[in-house]
Amino acid sequence: MNQEDAQRWFAAYLTEFEALGRGDADRRRILDHYGVPLLVSTEHGPMFFADAEQVLGVIGRQLDGMRAEGYARTEELASETTLLNPTCAVHRGRFARLRADGTEVARVEATYVITEGDGGPRISALLVHSG
């Protein structure tokens, strides 16, 4: 993986995430983008998900909440991708989650650790920033 590969992969992930957030795609497809195991860190503390069902559960709850708020799409407000080595990149981004009418559902800032293994690139850690 090089930096351009990581950026292209993240853009494809974001497109898929939008479809999942709207309910337009089978939520099991999230496993094409999130690694197992998965580390998620929020202001409430770190959480470690050791199997596919746990990953589907945590990401599924996030998607359900977005859908309940009328989520339609995400606008990436700022981002930076850094290649750490040939199998690992970090993507940091600030995002606006929007409804179909353009009103904002939420703003999110997060860092994604993307690792490349036998199944291709996956998000191995999702680090949600406070504030």
Model-derived segments and their meaning:
Residues 105-131:
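Short beta-strand edge/turn micro-motifs at domain boundaries
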Residues 27-81:
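A solvent-exposed, acidic/Ser-Thr-rich amphipathic alpha-helical stretch
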